[in-house]
Amino acid sequence: MPMVVAKRNARERTRVHTVNQAFLVLKQHLPSLRQFTKRVSKLRILNAAITYIDTLLKLIQSSEAVPQSVISATLGPIVPTPVRAVHKISKPDTVISQPIRPLAPVLPRHETYLPAPIAATCAPDHSLVDYRSTFASSLAPPVPMQMPSVFSPQPTFPYMKSLLDYPTYFYQPSTAPPPPPAPTAPQSHLIVNNQLVPMPSYQCF
């Protein structure tokens, strides 16, 4: 179903484009509308075409009595426009085409093209290439590439110690139970003024 809708929309766009091109060709052939560069309605183009055809018929009928200068002044210079208009007839194989006016191609914004002088300077200069050295280098035997070995001596750099390189005897937490308290010797006391006073102990060496 989406393919059918897409084809129908494409046919409709083609039809509208063909009609617009036909009206553009008709406008270019009308002296009264040729100077208008902006868009003109289709109804105005048709009315101007009818008036122009009537004027042509009258001039053709009275061309023997009217001088050529008056005809040129009335109709203006008839210049064929290089715009192509394709008219489809009853037979699908018969198509009448007129010369097409070259239209400027609409390029996307991301595409850029180099001008001719710059593009010409970018062409390679083959006159400076030494083909003899290239041919001799192509015949030379290939030189085996030496891969670096993991056992080859590596370059030495100044060694910096880390925390893992220092000894561990600076701080070693002890896991043994604390020692029992030392036994205290019995202390002697003196009675002074009916009070019990501890006697100082003396250590003998």
Swiss-Prot record:
Disruption phenotype: RNAi-mediated knockdown in a rrf-3 RNAi hypersensitive mutant background leads to decreased expression of srh-234 in the cell body of ADL sensory neurons.
InterPro entries referenced in this protein's UniProt entry, alphabetically: bHLH_dom, E-box_TF_Regulators, HLH_DNA-bd_sf
Region (Helix-loop-helix motif) location: 17-56
Source species, domain of life: Eukaryota
Listed PROSITE patterns: BHLH
Tissue-level expression: Expressed in the ADL sensory neurons.
Protein's UniProt keywords contain Protease: no
GO molecular function: bHLH transcription factor binding; DNA-binding transcription factor activity, RNA polymerase II-specific; protein dimerization activity; RNA polymerase II cis-regulatory region sequence-specific DNA binding; RNA polymerase II transcription regulatory region sequence-specific DNA binding
Subcellular location: Nucleus
Pfam families to which the protein is assigned, alphabetical: HLH
A biological process from GO: regulation of transcription by RNA polymerase II
Key words, A-Z: DNA-binding, Nucleus, Transcription, Transcription regulation
Region feature Basic motif, mapped onto this chain: 3-16
Keyword Magnesium appears in the UniProt entry: no
bHLH domain boundaries: 3-56
Known function: Acts as a transcriptional regulator. May mediate transcriptional activation by binding to the E-box motif 5'-CANNTG-3'. Required for the correct morphology, terminal identity and function of the ADL sensory neurons by controlling the expression of the ADL-specific gene repertoire, including chemoreceptor encoding genes, ion channel encoding genes, neuropeptides and the neurotransmitter eat-4. Regulates the expression of the srh-234 chemoreceptor encoding gene in the ADL neurons under feeding conditions.
Name of the protein in question: Helix-loop-helix protein 4
Protein source organism: Caenorhabditis elegans
Taxonomic lineage: Eukaryota, Metazoa, Ecdysozoa, Nematoda, Chromadorea
Gene that this polypeptide is encoded by: hlh-4
